[in-house]
A protein has these predicted regions:
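C-terminal cap of thioredoxin/glutaredoxin-like
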Residues: 3, 8, 12-13, 17-34, ...
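Structural alpha/beta surface segment adjacent to cysteine/selenocysteine redox centers
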Residues: 23-128, 133
Length: 223
């Protein structure tokens, strides 16, 4: 009789406004296809802009520089990244509404959340659209085919907003300081964008397929 192994749990902390998360998503999509049911993926919100306030000029410069660094990556998606989100006249005040939209979409299934997430990433990071605005959220949710009455109720719920704040606090208590961050099998925490080969190597290690991976920066055991 064949032994059934429990899937490896991977938690991905991300912010839909983060260019690095967008690139990480593209790389992780390859591994989702590659490993199939051997891995159970959980995508959790970690807002980089937690509080509702316009970014200062200094903050905007830093955000633009991050996008410009991400543009230099070799991924095809990197060439599509734009700084318009932060240089335009309507920069996001906070990440919370956009992340709340994704949690509301999650109630309609993981695919619903994934479709809305990719739509929001493209709108924000390629087209420079402020996806934290309620009118934009509803437009994108409608375009990806969500059931809008259910989505609206969940999106407007204070409980959904509290969930985002609670997730941020719990992640910070676990040692998460930025995004993208992966926690693989409750064992390895990988902070920042990594090469596809490095993600794969850590996954194979936790699946018991290879020896302990080579050390990298911002990598540590989870306690």
């Amino acid at each position: 009789m064949k032994t059934l192994h429990k899937p490896l749990q991977i938690t991905v902390y991300q912010d839909v406004l983060c260019a690095w998360c967008y690139l990480a998503d593209q790389r992780l999509d390859v591994l989702r296809q590659e490993f199939g049911e051997a891995i159970r993926w959980s995508v959790r919100p970690y807002p980089l802009r937690l509080h509702d306030a316009l970014p200062t000029e200094r903050e905007k410069r830093g955000l633009v520089e991050e996008v410009q660094r991400a543009q230099r990556e070799q991924d095809p998606a990197a060439r599509l990244l734009s700084t318009d989100l932060w240089l335009g006249g309507d920069p996001p005040r906070t990440s919370v509404p956009a992340l709340a939209a994704l949690e509301a979409a999650r109630l309609q299934g993981p695919q619903a959340r994934a479709f809305l997430a990719r739509s929001m990433q493209r709108a924000a990071l390629e087209q420079g659209i402020n996806v934290s605005r309620t009118d934009v959220v509803f437009e994108l949710a409608s375009r990806v085919g969500l059931a809008m009455n259910e989505f609206s109720a969940a999106f407007r719920s204070e409980e959904t907003r509290r969930l985002i704040l609670d997730e941020h606090r719990d992640a910070a208590n676990r040692g998460v300081r930025g995004v993208p961050t992966l926690v693989i099998g409750g064992r390895w925490m990988l902070c920042g964008l990594r090469e596809l080969s490095e993600y794969r190597e850590h996954i194979l290690t936790c699946l018991g397929k290879v020896a302990t991976p080579r050390s990298g920066s911002s990598e540590r055991l989870v306690h």
